Amino acid sequence: MKDAKNTFQNIHYNRQKPSFCLKVALGVGEFFYKKVINLKNFLYEINFLKEQKTDSYVICVGNLTTGGVGKTPIVIDLANELAKKENIAIISRGYKSKLSKKEAHIIKDFKELKFKNGSLCGDEPYQLAKKVKNNVVVITCPNRKKAIDLARIKFGIKTVVLDDGFSNRKVKKDKTILVIDSKMRFGNEHLLPFGPLREPISEIKRADEIILVNKGDENIDEARLWVEKFDKPFKIATFEPKSIYNLQSKAQVVNPKKQKAVAFCAIGQPSQFFDFAKRYYALPETVSFDDHHGYTKKDIKELVKVAKRNKTNIFITTQKDEAKLKCLVDDVSGYSFNVMELGVRIEEQ
């Protein structure tokens, strides 16, 4: 399964050419997917399908592609900035959450985080809840309207941020922000399953603003010129490592001095994290799991084997992964599981 996912991702981003038979199969799949997506958007445009209005001001932060573009840190930054003036709610669908999909769930209220780790509520909602200000509520529900209504009725919140909602047109948005990876962009520019696009590129017309994410891209000036062709206001978000801390003790790791470590993660674009990790550690081996992978004790045992093979007792992973690891590594003696925190700086253009 993992090999198949890697194959698709390589095809999506022009790192591998599909065989003739696979190309035909993917092309047929894309043809029917495109028909469905175009029909959906057409029905919304002629008001046959109607976007549900809410009593809240709704800001959507989304993307056109599958995989990680760096949306979560941007949602955190936006919510914390808005929270300087009023109470805010972040609404997430709760992808890979084990909670009931029929109800809206409060992951964090004004007082506390309701879950000890992300294994139950989902890694991204947990990460959001840990990093936002006290007056930011985090709620999950596939039914965004239900979650928005809960935020207003229970907490009196008037402004909500939808974490990933560009393709979901059931709720009317007051502002739509589209996040694009400056390096990966739209890959081969094909729709699923042939490419990474969930929506046609032409649907950028629905965005009010674009945030171009720079994760150490040397060609950011060229990317800036590329995004200008969409004729939308845009900003550039630059990601940089902010700190490294030990997951077990929470102590800061100061100047790792290129110690040997095993880097691992379960995110959409693992290579970008590994590039950051190489600035601080010598990485004899890296391990990538499927995006949103739920870690098990067996996974930890396998990681320890990798570390032993490479004669190190240090691991480095992401904050997104931290949410699912805490309950698994506390009793792993003799090994340090370190977490890299990324900071984001957003600049007007």
Name what the model sees in each region.
Residues 1-16, 185-311:
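C-terminal accessory "lid"/substrate-recognition subdomains
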